[in-house]
């Protein structure tokens, strides 16, 4: 994958997250802000999830209350470099824990 492909894939992922949050109908208020390729999700309890791209490594990083994760793109999805867990599944798990209700990204 070259840098251009990486940015296109990372942009698609960020846009999908934004669209999912914009259509979220749960009770929790989840705000998001994107600045310089870094997306920050802020929850009612003040906790945050940070998603950012690491261009030199062609990775997307996810920082949650439970820990940090690095994701590589393969076979149409982003997978954790340690556990093999898919990005949207891990994000759903972390967002649900931090929101106190089910938050599904796919």
Curated annotation (Swiss-Prot):
The Gene Ontology terms for molecular function here are: ferric iron binding; ferrous iron binding
Cross-referenced PROSITE patterns: FRATAXIN_1, FRATAXIN_2
What SUPFAM superfamilies does the annotation carry?
Answer: Frataxin/Nqo15-like
Coiled-coil spans are: none
Q: Name one GO cellular component term.
A: cytosol
Which UniProt keywords are given for this protein, alphabetically ordered?
Answer: Iron, Metal-binding
Per the record, the GO terms for biological process are: iron-sulfur cluster assembly
Mention any Pfam family matching this sequence.
Frataxin_Cyay
Has UniProt tagged this entry with the keyword Methyltransferase? no
Which residues are listed as membrane-spanning?
A: none
Known role: Involved in iron-sulfur (Fe-S) cluster assembly. May act as a regulator of Fe-S biogenesis.
**What is the official name of this protein in its record?**
Iron-sulfur cluster assembly protein CyaY
Q: What species is given as this protein's source?
A: Yersinia pestis
Name of the gene: cyaY
């Amino acid at each position: 994958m070259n840098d251009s492909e990486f940015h296109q894939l990372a942009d698609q992922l960020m846009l999908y997250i934004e669209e999912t949050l914009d259509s979220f109908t749960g009770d929790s208020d989840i705000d998001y802000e994107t600045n310089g390729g870094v997306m920050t999700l802020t929850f009612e309890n003040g906790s945050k999830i940070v998603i950012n791209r690491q261009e030199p490594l062609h990775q997307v990083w996810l920082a949650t209350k439970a820990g940090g994760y690095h994701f590589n793109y393969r076979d149409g999805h982003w997978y954790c470099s340690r556990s093999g867990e898919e990005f949207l599944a891990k994000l759903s798990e972390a967002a649900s824990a931090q929101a106190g209700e089910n938050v599904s990204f796919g």
